[in-house]
Amino acid sequence: MSEQRRATTHLIGGFSGGLVSAIILQPFDLLKTRLQQDKTSTLWKTLKSIETPSQLWRGALPSCIRTSVGSAMYLTMLNSIRQAISKGKNTGSTGSSYLPQLNMYENMFSGAVTRALTGLITMPITVIKVRYESTLYQYTSLRYATSHIFRTEGLRGFFRGFGATALRDAPYAGLYMLFYDRMKVLVPTLLPSNVVKLNSDNRYSTYASTLINGSSAFSAAVIATSITAPFDTVKTRMQLEPAKFHSFTSTFWHIATKESVRNLFAGISLRLTRKAFSAGIAWGIYEEIVKKFV
């Protein structure tokens, strides 16, 4: 297969997985944003403020654009970096995946660098999405949201909170890739032997590999999300209240000392749920598309 077709396959796989997960899990993202914007809010109070079910999908369009395009870019770049690292090395792969296995440091490096680059490129969409989901801004359309940010803050406004985002996403992606690679080896040992039978090509069935990859992605996301949760809260505050919160350090210190350390983990249950299921869905779809067409 040509390199161009191989890259296209990774683009389509990443886009498809990201789009499906974004549509299904948008309500969790919206509730998380609103919980983080108000230090006194609770999940129950936030749910009561939702007037119609359709409001749970407010901000779905920028979320779908960011997640699908971001996922396509991320997974394509990630594969290129991982292939470059593994070139000339006998890295091998697991029975559920065609992706090369790397060591701990290579996994963390490839995930962190790729996520930071993708985050920078998709940052304007992220800022618009967060503001649109929030009740602090009464944006009536994405066009108005975009023009308002540009008019009041300039181009810099579209990259508000990038430092905190990079500090959250780069370690998250590095940790995620580390645990995901390890889980793909561990999960088959925990499943019934009749489920994880290898075929003549030393590969698992579509059902088994989807189960293994989805479960591995889910577990890896739970661990990585728990560790990086405070960075997400700081990032959201900086994007919602730029006049009050100017830097990562001052925002982190304000929340930890003026409010409570617990507030650094505001919305973690929703973020855990969304990130875990998002990873399970997106990587499950992505891995199967790559297996079918690469």
Swiss-Prot record:
Residue windows of the Solcar repeats: 5-84, 102-186, 208-292
Looking up SUPFAM superfamilies in the UniProt record yields: Mitochondrial carrier
Q: What is its main location?
A: mitochondrion
Question: What is the species listed in this Swiss-Prot or TrEMBL entry?
Answer: Kluyveromyces lactis (strain ATCC 8585 / CBS 2359 / DSM 70799 / NBRC 1267 / NRRL Y-1140 / WM37)
So where does this one cross the membrane? 11-36, 59-85, 108-133, 161-184, 212-238, 267-285
Q: Enumerate the InterPro entries for this protein.
A: Hem25/SLC25A38 (IPR030847), Mit_carrier (IPR002067), Mitochondrial_sb/sol_carrier (IPR018108), Mt_carrier_dom_sf (IPR023395)
Protein name, UniProt field: Mitochondrial glycine transporter
Q: Where in the cell is it found?
A: Mitochondrion inner membrane
HAMAP family registered for this protein in UniProt: SLC25A38
Topologically, how does it sit relative to the membrane? Multi-pass membrane protein
Q: Which GO terms describe its cellular component?
A: mitochondrial inner membrane
Q: Briefly state the protein's biological role.
A: Mitochondrial glycine transporter that imports glycine into the mitochondrial matrix. Plays an important role in providing glycine for the first enzymatic step in heme biosynthesis, the condensation of glycine with succinyl-CoA to produce 5-aminolevulinate (ALA) in the mitochondrial matrix.
Which superkingdom heads the taxonomic lineage of this protein's source? Eukaryota
> Which Gene3D superfamilies does the UniProt record give?
Mitochondrial carrier domain (1.50.40.10)
- UniProt keyword list: Membrane, Mitochondrion, Mitochondrion inner membrane, Repeat, Transmembrane, Transmembrane helix, Transport
